[in-house]
Amino acid sequence: MAEYQNFFNQVQVAGAPEMGLKEDVDTFERTPAGMFNILGWMGNAQIGPIYLGIAGTVSLAFGAAWFFTIGVWYWYQAGFDPFIFMRDLFFFSLEPPPAEYGLAIAPLKQGGVWQIASLFMAISVIAWWVRVYTRADQLGMGKHMAWAFLSAIWLWSVLGFWRPILMGSWSVAPPYGIFSHLDWTNQFSLDHGNLFYNPFHGLSIAALYGSALLFAMHGATILAVTRFGGERELEQIVDRGTASERAALFWRWTMGFNATMEGIHRWAIWMAVMVTLTGGIGILLSGTVVDNWYVWAQVHGYAPVTP
């Protein structure tokens, strides 16, 4: 029997664009908006209005400078040969300064370009966080997205800033490159006695898997009750209807209890935030507090002690 599953199908309503809040605000800085059916396959069919402001403009400018700096270095490594540039693009790498430079400013070809690119990236990321915070504040929203983003910034800053400072050298920071970044990650684990024995790494992976599981469960649940209006979650939160009642009953039948239409989002944000929060702690402790996680695990009784 044919059934509306809603895995790939979507309903698009094309009307006048929603321009957002207009009361007591200047809208001259907002771009126009329009409807695009192809965009509607993934989300809302409307694109715009877009507001960058000072923080957004600074973020995009310095983000572009970071990207351009790395690209110029790759172009230099390719000998200014477009064929070699395209062929070896994934193999090129912008490396941090060698250990002998410590935390000092290095010559351009000895890691100075990496330091410049990292400065551009830091300004871009911080400015974007400011933009996320101020946009939420201007809309009268909670700052949940800014604080969640800050957790990701924590892991990023530990890798490229806090841990190198504690270790006394920029050389321990990751490079900018596709395969070189993967090699750095593998070598990091080898240098510190197998990262799998780092309990904070384990917590991070558990939260990562948990985030994927929660996302799949929540997405499947809402799609399963869209025929009853379940996608209108705000309405279901304040006035529980048959959609949320059926979804809740399904999970009580399945595993004995259920989240609420509001609570599942609290589960999701904390599970996602814990991925980068605990991951950053685990990275920060590696080499600064614990040199070898396998030996640490042996001492604490959960890794085998080989004779």
From Swiss-Prot:
Gene Ontology CC terms: plasma membrane light-harvesting complex; plasma membrane-derived chromatophore membrane
Membrane topology annotation: Multi-pass membrane protein
UniProt key word Mitochondrion: no
Keywords in alphabetical order: Bacteriochlorophyll, Chlorophyll, Chromophore, Electron transport, Iron, Magnesium, Membrane, Metal-binding, Photosynthesis, Reaction center, Transmembrane, Transmembrane helix, Transport
Lineage: Bacteria, Pseudomonadati, Pseudomonadota, Alphaproteobacteria, Rhodobacterales
One protein family per Pfam: Photo_RC
Record field: transmembrane: 52-78, 110-139, 142-167, 197-225, 259-285
Entry binding sites for (7R,8Z)-bacteriochlorophyll b: 181, 201
Residues annotated to bind a ubiquinone: 251
Subunit structure: Reaction center is composed of four bacteriochlorophylls, two bacteriopheophytins, two ubiquinones, one iron, and three highly hydrophobic polypeptide chains (designated L, M, and H).
Functional description taken from the UniProt entry: The reaction center is a membrane-bound complex that mediates the initial photochemical event in the electron transfer process of photosynthesis.
GO biological process, alphabetically ordered: photosynthetic electron transport in photosystem II
Main localisation: membrane
Protein name, entry field: Reaction center protein M chain
Subcellular localization, as worded in the UniProt entry: Cellular chromatophore membrane
Family: Belongs to the reaction center PufL/M/PsbA/D family.
GO molecular function, one term: electron transporter, transferring electrons within the cyclic electron transport pathway of photosynthesis activity
